[in-house]
């Protein structure tokens, strides 16, 4: 995870090592770059990652805008977010809280609302919306835990919590909380929790099909009924 950091810091003095603590944006950037190499087999060179990954660009712009907003600076945070959306196709409100090591893969069409919270090392695919459900004030966007995978086109709406290591199936519409280590699939989504199973975060071929499971259960009950006739 910290391979890039070690490459840059190896052989430098303690003063340079302490510099990481004073430059949180640089620390976050190295974490974001490292997670891209870990999760994207298409990433082959650091220069390519720095120049050609819009998800990385959007996160860098957001961290800058968020920091300025926290300092009470008007206008500039929203302008940076607006410019970032124009350049990357990714809309992250400056008020959103985004953890470290987040990977926005492909990214086009991703929307993250003002009061959304995204935990560390989450994987977000293109077309994802972390949005609200109306004009309510206060916390009105989702809180996403750590190591969560949100599939392409999924919509997570309202003041709900997505637990750590949860998975959201592609195209799902999530309107209620998802417990940790569970999967939400469907429109509207249904939670499926499998005990003692740990799926690879990048493997979307093993997502549970709740409709198919219900059909199998119905067919099994019909078969049992026939045996008693």
Regions found by a protein language model. Give the residues of each.
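Soluble, non-transmembrane catalytic domains of enzymes that act on hydrophobic metabolites at membranes
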Residues: 2-36
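Extended, small-residue-rich solenoid/repeat segments and analogous flexible loops
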Residues: 56-105
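Membrane-proximal helical "anchor" segments flanking the first transmembrane region
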Residues: 25-61, 65
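Structural signal for interior beta-strand "rungs" in well-ordered beta-sheet cores
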Residues: 85-192
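Acidic, low-complexity intrinsically disordered segments
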Residues: 177, 181-223
């Amino acid at each position: 995870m910290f391979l890039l950091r070690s490459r840059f810091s190896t052989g430098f003095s303690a003063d340079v090592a302490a510099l990481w603590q004073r430059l949180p944006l640089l620390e976050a950037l190295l974490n974001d770059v490292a997670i891209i190499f870990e999760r994207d087999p298409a990433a082959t060179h650091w220069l390519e990652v720095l120049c050609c990954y819009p998800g990385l660009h959007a996160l860098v712009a957001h961290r800058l805008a968020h920091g300025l907003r926290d300092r009470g600076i008007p206008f500039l945070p929203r302008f940076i977010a607006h410019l970032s959306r124009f350049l990357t196709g990714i809309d992250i409100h400056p008020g959103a809280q985004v953890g470290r090591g987040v990977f926005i893969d492909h990214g086009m069409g991703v929307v993250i609302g003002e009061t959304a919270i995204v935990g560390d090392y989450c994987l977000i695919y293109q077309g994802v919306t972390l949005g609200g459900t109306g004009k309510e004030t206060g916390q009105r966007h989702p809180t996403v835990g750590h190591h969560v995978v949100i599939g392409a086109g999924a919509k997570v709406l309202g003041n709900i919590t997505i637990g750590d290591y949860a998975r959201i199936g592609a195209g799902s519409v999530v309107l209620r909380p998802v417990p940790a280590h569970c999967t939400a699939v469907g429109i509207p989504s249904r939670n499926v929790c499998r005990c003692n199973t740990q799926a690879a975060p990048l493997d979307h071929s093993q997502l549970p099909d709740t409709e198919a499971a219900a059909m199998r259960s119905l067919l099994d009950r019909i078969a049992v009924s026939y045996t008693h006739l």
